[in-house]
Regions:
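Juxtamembrane intracellular "pre-TM" segments in multi-pass secondary transporters
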Residues: 1-25, 212
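Pair of pore-lining "gating" transmembrane helices in MFS-fold secondary transporters
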Residues: 17-37, 120-121
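Short amphipathic helix-loop junctions that connect adjacent transmembrane helices
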Residues: 40-55
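Small-residue hotspots at the loop-to-helix junctions and early N-terminal turns
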Residues: 53-61, 150
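Helix-to-loop junctions at the C-terminal end of transmembrane segments
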Residues: 70-85
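Intrinsic disorder in cytosolic terminal tails and internal cytosolic loops
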Residues: 84, 196-212
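C-terminal transmembrane helical hairpin of 12-TM major facilitator-type secondary transporters
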Residues: 85-133
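A late C-terminal transmembrane helix in Major Facilitator Superfamily
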Residues: 135-176, 181-182
Length: 212
């Protein structure tokens, strides 16, 4: 089948002009930036700041394990509760934990145990948020799912990678820049979702789907 540039252009236009598609892709971009920031900063924070040495793998695994458990929990509750209720609640928890993280860092009372606990809660909320945000972004794109997935993925991964790099490069020997980065990313994602849904968090603003 020959490639039709006009069909491709129409599909791109649908993806980039649909409120749900763009809004949730941008929110995912910010949250992905937070994840990439964690991955890029984890060794410096755990090894240099907290001095965990060869326990780094265990510390990292604890946080990753929380994400895995949250993913399993999501699979059990999302059909009963709904994507929006799960993800909107989770992103609010993400913001709250990120702000608490920043406060403890600024106050100088953040121990290794506190850091790991807050990271587990943050990344658990991240897992509950992002899988559902991705599904919501794709919801009105069923007819052009392949193109939509490619465009949204590019926005999320490229933008998130750049944000994560900024967070990682901001490391100054403390957890303050990292915690601030997560708080900014989470707050930005929540604001974008609220605007996208016209303030109807947990219920949603329903835009007509793409028609091809």
């Amino acid at each position: 089948m020959p490639i039709d540039p006009r069909s491709i252009a129409r599909a791109w236009r649908h993806v980039l002009t649909n409120r749900m598609s763009v809004g949730y892709a941008l929110a995912l971009m910010l949250l992905s930036g937070a994840l990439f920031g964690f991955i890029g900063s984890a060794q410096q924070i755990f090894v240099e700041h907290f001095g965990v040495g060869n326990r780094f793998g265990l510390c990292f695994a604890a946080v990753a394990g929380a994400m895995g458990l949250a993913g399993y929990l999501n699979s059990r509750i999302v059909e009963r509760v709904g994507m929006r209720k799960v993800s909107h609640t989770a992103v609010i928890i993400f913001v709250a934990m990120a702000v608490l993280h920043l406060i403890t860092a600024l106050a100088g009372i953040e121990t290794l145990a506190v850091f790991i606990l807050l990271q587990m809660l943050l990344m658990g909320a991240f897992a509950l948020t992002t899988s559902n945000f991705n599904a919501i972004a794709m919801e009105p794109m069923a007819v052009i799912a392949g193109t939509a997935s490619s465009v949204q993925g590019a926005i999320t991964q490229i933008g998130g990678g750049l944000i994560g790099a900024i967070i990682g490069q901001a490391y100054d020997g403390t957890t303050i820049p990292y915690s601030l980065g997560l708080a900014v990313c989470g707050s930005g994602a929540l604001a974008i979702v609220a605007i996208t849904e016209r303030g109807r968090l947990f219920r949603g603003y329903h835009q007509p789907p793409a028609t091809g």
